[in-house]
Amino acid sequence: MRNIGFLSFGWWSGAPGSRVRTAGDVLEDTIRLAEAAEDAGMDGAWMRVHHFEQNTSSPFPLLAAMGARTSRVELGTGVINMRYENPLYMAEAAATADLISGGRLQLGVSRGSPESAADGPGTFGYPLPVGTTPAEDSAQRIAQFREAISGAGIAEPGAHAHVREGEKLPIQPHSPGLSDRIWYGAGGNDSARRVGELGMHLMSSTLVLEATGEPLGVVQSRQIDIFRTAWREAGHAGEPRVSVSRSIMPIVDDLTTTYFGPHLERDRMGANRDQIGEIDNAVSTFGKTYVGDLDKLEKELREDEAVMSADTLLVTIPNQLGADFNRITFDAFAELRERLRS
């Protein structure tokens, strides 16, 4: 593991204790989180994308603003449900945000996850075509998006187009290199293998769609190996990157003790462990929360095979506590990265 970033779920609510009470609050605070991560020496600022819920949804205006207020950190999504997207419009928006950031976007995409709306994509104007599965529909949209951001010509020219004979019109603007920075959120071994074959990077979260009774890190490490083997056998150039997400609560002062202390007590009682449950009709392994001082966190994370195998660790953060609180934990995460690198 050599990079560490945060993953904000982007929630807002008027609940007692929330520092992020409105949609406007969460947008401004997410920008401040990116600035705080950069100031602390972290490597990435990533955001969750969900629709029809009180959290961040349309990512590209926010990513552009984060890019304008930072200069170094990677800016990512975890993940964009492609069934909601017009791939060509998304290609324009993504390239625009990437150019504003100076080429720092890392875009995680997927076929989506369980959500609030009965048929969200259909409501957005993208009903599932007859005879097509959600996975197939998503795969087609991803392929079209990747072609569009590659700079390839995709539209037939009209009478007033300024192109050579036989050429097609590409999406504009084009951001060179963006097509090499597309990730896929894979839940199981088959999808991890397919991601490697297609030449996208792998995102693996705090759960996997497999339940063997083994720790999440062991199951996930096997998924990472499958992905890297598939990438290599497909002959792709460049480095196959992998991120894993974890819930990590560093206790470093009185304030973090106040918020995270109850989780530490559960940990001491043995109630904090990986669990097996069901999501989207699939039996899955859910990861535990890592909580404690830096020595304890370092020891336990070193024992997590997936964390040590991945190049990037994304820490899910309590974004509703606000950027000022999370800035305290960001210093701890940056130190953890240095410890785990050695």
Model regions: which residues?
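Hydrophobic faces of well-ordered beta-strands that scaffold small-molecule active sites
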Residues: 4-8, 45-47, 75-78, 105-109, ...
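Glycine-rich, proline-tolerant flexible connector loops at the mouths of alpha/beta enzymes
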Residues: 44-66, 81, 206-217, 316-325
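Flexible, glycine-rich active-site loops centered on histidine and acidic residues
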Residues: 1-23, 84-154, 210
